[in-house]
């Protein structure tokens, strides 16, 4: 069994359902400390975070490449639906099964073993290697990577490159990597009316009727045209509630929840202003609460993307597509202190599902790609 596969199975065997790390980071810390990494545990409200760094011969003048990821996994769902227990690694049909196999314990193991092989081959490497690991990525993500980034920023620590081990690939290892992500902003809208008997509408004010024209306009609005890297911004309703359940009562208020997925072509302030303008134009009496869970980030083509594309092609023969599709990730936090952030990991077809798995043929090539990037950028 390869070193990467053995470590992957060791991590999968830890039932680290978010935010419980289940000592996964302790396993990683022991391996990193043996390589000469300075390891720091940063705990926050039940969340375990790890910051580990190994400087090269250039000290702080050398380029720093960070590997970022998460030890937490999503809940298993009904155990009886799993073919084999989710926290007992199992091999079937050329695949490794277990919760976290794809998202993202194989990436974590590949980070570690790639670093071990790199340091053994390049003991006098010039640049620095770092690890930023959290147990709060699959949950609220309020005490994980964002807290470590805030701490590093306060210390004046800047990263040059960061690879986030998210499962970005589609059919083959390396066919898709993420060089950016859209931002996410949600709104909770309450439109006020006047409750009354449905037979006497002149004595009431129906908030559903009042909201409907504004809702139609919001749904039809083109928020931007996107750009070279991002599709156009989208606005979608996630929840709409009104009424008491009775058939003869006009409701007193209508509640709407919606979400923007927005690109670098729009700003938080600009989108908020346009929503308020539409609501105000329709004369609504309303309250609107905003929450921004992530800003968009983008890494244009450069040293990191070139190194990663070259490493993937050399290892797998696959031509890589740079993409910004999908949901948010911790890359949105890291981008605050790192100009080049790219996500790359195994295929994502089984993530968060029953019988999550990774094809065994991808395990060592994933490690090799990470090692090749280290060799290109910080040797």
Curated annotation (Swiss-Prot):
Its EC number is 3.5.1.18. It is an enzyme of class 3 (hydrolase). Homodimer. Keywords: Amino-acid biosynthesis, Cobalt, Diaminopimelate biosynthesis, Hydrolase, Lysine biosynthesis, Metal-binding, Zinc. Belongs to the peptidase M20A family. DapE subfamily. It comes from the Bacteria. Its cofactor is Zn(2+); Co(2+). This is Succinyl-diaminopimelate desuccinylase. The active site is at 72, 137 (proton acceptor). The gene is dapE. GO terms for biological process: diaminopimelate biosynthetic process; L-arginine biosynthetic process; lysine biosynthetic process via diaminopimelate. GO terms for molecular function: acetylornithine deacetylase activity; cobalt ion binding; succinyl-diaminopimelate desuccinylase activity; zinc ion binding.
